């Protein structure tokens, strides 16, 4: 029996996530009142067939009933009902933009203030986030990328106990990824920004990757990084960790970080690990140092 509780911040993508879970064969329920959680779990565990995999959304829309969630989770544990929590997060800036684009008000907004609503919701969800087995930061994820992450966790992830590794390239000027487990600074590597023919390209272009990796320091660093990650992965798997987010940053997130992300991605893929790669800032830094 697979029982997934999807929660997180308003505007972070829970409605989209539950649709994808349905595509993956889960029986899905959106906005279940927390007071009904234990009874619903009992029905699911007594059922067979389509109820063998269940995903449901519980969030702040439950209003006053949301306060009952923790007691409901305790009752589920006492009854022997196993569950896991998926928490969807995003930056304040991204959430505000999404609310403005959809012209919706935040469910906890005071006098229509979206930032105040987000801050209040973060505080209310802080303890729940700590209980989550999986946390997905959707700040820079397109819809298809969210589906890919969910697929790796809840479809491919069921096929083995291997770690799911997410490699994120980024620019320090845009901030470190919120969900990073490991952060590597590659601003000491040769910068293609100063080469006129490469300035407007990114590490997704072979010319840029060749320029960066032709430097002995880049090769040496890459080899040492590969060795370190190869050493760490079995340790994380042994302690039961199922997601590892490796963030690689340069100045603008355009050239060097993207290049090293590609090299590490290929290295891990060749060794059979399940790896995702996301170049968070590669399209934000055109014409800036990267």
From Swiss-Prot:
NCBIfam families: PRK05416.1. One of its GO terms (molecular function) is ATP binding. ATP binds at residues 8-15. Keywords: ATP-binding, GTP-binding, Nucleotide-binding. It comes from Alkaliphilus oremlandii (strain OhILAs). It comes from the Bacteria. GTP binds at residues 59-62. Displays ATPase and GTPase activities. InterPro entries: P-loop_NTPase, RapZ-like, RapZ-like_N, RapZ_C. This is Nucleotide-binding protein Clos_0574. The keyword ATP-binding applies. SUPFAM superfamilies: P-loop containing nucleoside triphosphate hydrolases (SSF52540). Belongs to the RapZ-like family.
């Amino acid at each position: 029996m697979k029982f997934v509780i999807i929660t997180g911040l308003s505007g972070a993508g829970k409605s989209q996530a539950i649709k994808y879970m349905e595509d993956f064969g889960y029986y899905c329920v959106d906005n279940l009142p927390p007071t009904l959680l234990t009874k619903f779990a009992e029905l699911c565990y007594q059922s067979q067939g389509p109820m063998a995999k269940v995903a449901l959304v519980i969030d702040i829309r439950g209003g006053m009933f949301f306060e009952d969630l923790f007691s409901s989770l305790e009752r589920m544990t006492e009854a022997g009902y196993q569950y896991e929590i998926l928490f969807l997060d995003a930056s304040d800036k991204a959430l505000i933009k999404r609310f403005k684009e959809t012209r919706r008000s935040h469910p906890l907004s005071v006098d229509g203030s979206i930032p105040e609503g987000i801050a209040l919701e973060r505080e209310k969800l802080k303890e729940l986030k700590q209980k989550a087995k999986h946390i997905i930061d959707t700040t820079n994820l397109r819809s298809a990328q969210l589906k890919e992450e969910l697929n790796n966790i809840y479809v491919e992830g069921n096929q083995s106990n291997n770690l799911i590794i997410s490699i994120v390239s980024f620019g320090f000027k845009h901030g470190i990824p919120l969900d990073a487990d490991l952060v590597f600074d590659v601003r000491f590597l040769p910068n293609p920004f100063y080469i006129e023919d490469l300035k407007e390209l990114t590490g997704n272009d072979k010319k840029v990757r060749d320029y960066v990796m032709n430097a002995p320091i880049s090769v040496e660093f890459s080899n040492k990084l590969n060795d370190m990650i190869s050493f760490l992965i079995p340790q994380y798997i042994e302690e039961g960790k199922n997601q590892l987010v490796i963030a690689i940053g340069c100045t603008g997130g355009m050239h060097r970080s993207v290049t090293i992300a590609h090299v590490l991605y290929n290295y891990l893929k060749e060794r059979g690990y399940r790896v995702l790669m996301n170049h968070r800032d590669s399209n934000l830094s055109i014409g800036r140092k990267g």
